Amino acid sequence: MDAQIHRWYAEAPKVFPKKPYFSPSSANACPRELYHKALGDPRDITRKPPYQGRWTRIGTAIGDMIQRDLLFMEKHFEKKVGRPCPFSFERNPDGTPMFEDFAKRNHKIERGGKTFHLFGTCDGIMRYVTEDGEVLRVGLEIKSKQTSAARTSFYSLKKPDEKHVKQCVAYAEMYGVDLYVILYVNASKKAWEYEEGEFEKSPDIRAFGLEIGREDIDVLLDRFVEIQNSIDDGKPMAVDLNGWTFNGYKTAIAQSLTAAELEAIRDKVSRVKRSNVFDSTKRQYAGALEFIEKVRKGEAV
């Protein structure tokens, strides 16, 4: 199995984005960030601590592990269980599974007088055979959790993250599927062995099913059209501070803000500080404003 996977990747096709484009992973990103990205403004240069690099690679390895497990089950499930495996990866004409480099594509969108592409790849497009023989195409999105074992508990994780749902909506349009599974895999553990009943409260994997309708896709595409209009017209949209931590264009944004926009951000941060939102959200908003103020004063950040 591993040798076959390595052979596939050794001959993986090269697919490059057709501009203008949006990535499914940016479906919920700050519109101001996407504006500066489209203009080709420089990304922030940040020093990533070694531990962040390790965490990122662990997240990638988790996705690879799940995909390998699914391929292994395709091959051996029936022999071990005594009935056909109900699911398998959809295959390309050359026999490669429909995931990662073998599913990467540019999907053209013409909407609202604008033309752009959705560019990227998915964690998998599966074929699920129901008990009555119906074949359903189901998308798969794998997400890792690493901060604590409780992140995938039934108490903490009651529904999938909204940004992950929107990412799947973009994939639904790209691959023509209306069913999706978001699988959360937790790399943290409370202990090597659990007391009876403890694991059931905080399992290391959680799966959520989505049924994606045309209206969900229309809402997302309309958002991309709005952002593309702002890019073409040179009129950037407001900053969304909710995703500031992972915003790659903080400096460009800070420098492009008008005085009125800066004042609006100050007011927003002030209101958030007085609200009853999580302390982590308050810190993120306050940190964003502090960064912006320093950049505009010419101070090193």
Predicted regions and their residues:
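Generic structural signal for alpha-helix starts
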Residues: 23, 49, 161, 270, ...
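Metal-dependent nuclease catalytic regions and adjoining charged, substrate-binding loops involved
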Residues: 177-301
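Metal-dependent nuclease catalytic cores that hydrolyze phosphodiester bonds in DNA/RNA
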Residues: 1-139, 146, 282-301
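Mg2+/Mn2+-dependent nuclease catalytic core
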Residues: 95-229
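Short linear functional motifs in flexible/disordered or boundary regions
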Residues: 42, 74, 78, 151-152, ...
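Intrinsically disordered, low-complexity segments enriched in small/polar residues
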Residues: 6-7, 19, 33, 169, ...
